Structure formats: C-alpha cells, structure tokens
Amino acid sequence: MKIVLNKCFGGFELSHVACLYLCELKGIDVHSYLAESKNDTYHFKKIDKSYKKSNVFECVWYLKNELPKMELSLEENWDFLEHIDLDFDGANRADLDLIRTVEIFGEAANPIYSKLTIVEIPDGNDFIIHENDGFESVVYGQNLGKA
C-alpha cells in the first residue's frame, strides 16, 4: 500500500497547482483566492493554476462557490462561504487520488516547506504517522489501535 509523507521540516501541504489537480480528480469544482487580512476586512484576489506561493504567510482559500465581492468585513455574514476541506490526516494519506497527484507532479507537488514522498508499506497493515515539526515517519503493523 502506498502512502504520502512529508520528509522535511515544515508540514504536509500540496502546492497550489497540485491541489487544483486533486480537486479535479475528485470532481470538485474549485474557486481559489489569495486572502489577505487588513484590520477588520479580508481582501481577496482570484488566482489560477499559474499562482505560486512566494512565502509561507500567504493564505490561499479553496471555495466551492465564487465570491460575490472581493472584500468582506468581519461584521458581515459569512455563511455563504463553503470551504473545500482536503483532509490529509491519517488514512487519507493512502487516498489514491492524492497518491496519483504526487506521482504526476513530483517535485511540483511541493510548496515552500514540504517534500512529499510516497512510501510503500505492506498491504493490509494499519499505520500511524508520527510528526516532528512537520517531518514525518510511519509506523505500521496489524491491529495497532490507538495509544
């Protein structure tokens, strides 16, 4: 069984273009925005596949619907926002679409502080991912349970 781990300090994250591709594989219509907070207002800029994060503090939002406007204050009703949650915890690291995305994009699947690597463990094993400041390792076996 293949699983995806992050093998550098920083954290598990997909690059923007890899994230868009993964959404496409899953049949999710996605609208991506660069979000910046100033005082009590969020400013948004629509981004496409060519966008590359230039620093770790940039925040990209993946939404199910287009935003009706490019500025939203904290006092407004935000109920219309539907974030796309690509959960990369636990068993989801063996997700076939995630593995395919990392295989296809290779190094381009990595943003600034990730080095995604596909590792193989014997089929039928449970696994637990251990993380130290973003750097991950895996323990696998039968009936691992929870500690």
What kind of feature is each model-predicted range?
Residues M1-A147:
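Catalytic phosphate/metal-binding cores of nucleic-acid and nucleotide-processing enzymes, i.e., regions
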